[in-house]
Amino acid sequence: MSLDAVLSRIDETLPEAMDRLFALLRIPSISTDPAYRADCARAADWLAEDLRGLGFDAAARATPGHPMVVGHGGEGGRHLLFYGHYDVQPVDPLDLWHRAPFDPTVEDTPHGRVIRARGAADDKGQLMTFIEACRAWRDVHGALPGRLTVFLEGEEESGSPSLIPFMERHREELKADLALICDTGLFEDQPAITTMLRGLLGEEITITGPNKDLHSGSYGGAAMNPIRVLAGIIASLHDEDGRITVPGFYDGVTDLPEAVRAQWQALAFDHRKFLGEVGLSVPAGEHDRTPLEMLWSRPTCEVNGIWGGYTGAGFKTVLPSQAHAKISFRLVPGQDPHRLRDNFRNHVRTMVPFDCQVAFHEHGASAASVMDISDPAFEAARAALGQEWGRPASYVGCGGSIPIAGYFRSILDMDAMLIGFGRDDDQIHSPNEKYDVESFHKGIRSWARIFAALT
């Protein structure tokens, strides 16, 4: 079958593909906020209808949370399952957006044209690259490129509470030869296949001291201040060399193989440029590790939020009853998230004084994943990406967490390949999220080339 005709069709119909993406981006499918539940269902229905128009047998499947979209189509060749997620992050702080987050537009920037909207890169723009490649292939050849399953989640940004039960319940339906995940990015301007993902452990802690807020003049110096207790706990989590002090935290962590270390060094990662783009200059983390190691292959502990007492306008001399913090850990192969949760909580308990209490609330746990690149499909996809982007594709790590990659292995007994077209400056999870028009266009073309290589 002619690949050139498909690529030409993609080029010719890019404006229509952008229109469809914009229609999806206008739906505020924020999964963490119950106020947007109907919008999440609307996004799922929109995608199911679009897939049906391409010849998929597709539907939005109900779950206790937000719907899953599942579509089956095509025949012959290697059975590929594509995964993406249609839910998006909240838009706070809204006042930092240059325009309404769900009013997508194309902007001209010094670095090229970009699509500006919440979800543009994470993950609506990415998932639509796959769907648009299917559309162009069908337009040219009258059929989908092979046997395909599309599996789109609506709770990825809120911990995926329905994902494992759904996958276990529909194990046989979802089973394929290989999973394709489009939720990662390029390395600089170079195409990449992600082969290592860190796991994630989320914890919220609340320290309670007095049974109500107190006047700091009447009680200050005599009553325990939970903010001070919490600050001490947070300060205790790292030593002066940047290592995490939770007992047993590094159990099972191994050093990076020399071959992988050499490959990463060959990428010529410029940490000064990487940090400079966000107004920083000095690498943090363990002092004896390179920035790429810290980003991709070392575990971390970060404070994501801390609050308590009075934070409104003006000043209030309050001694608060409670203090709160949200803390996340990025994990690497060999670490057990459930054991680490226990170790962290035990560490915190040892630091809570007699007159205070601590409560914990968990926010998900997933182990790290390492992909098996011995499958010939990886080299075939790598070559296809290189042809499209005009430069070799690299195998890279990813500091983020995509639990579905591990679930494909543990639940469905199949490998996953992670290919994406995002960039470091896409501002995912932040105001003014964007997705390069080039990433969208060449992403569609990349999938068409991968179809030709794998199906």
Regions found by a protein language model. Name each.
Residues 121, 211, 329-336, 366:
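A generic structural motif
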Residues 77-149, 442:
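Active-site metal-coordination/substrate-binding segment of hydrolases
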Residues 53, 188, 245-322, 333-346, ...:
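An extended, acidic, His-containing surface patch that forms the Zn2+-binding/catalytic region
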Residues 86-88, 151-160, 182-187, 209-211, ...:
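Acidic, glycine-rich active-site loops and adjacent beta-strand->loop/helix elements
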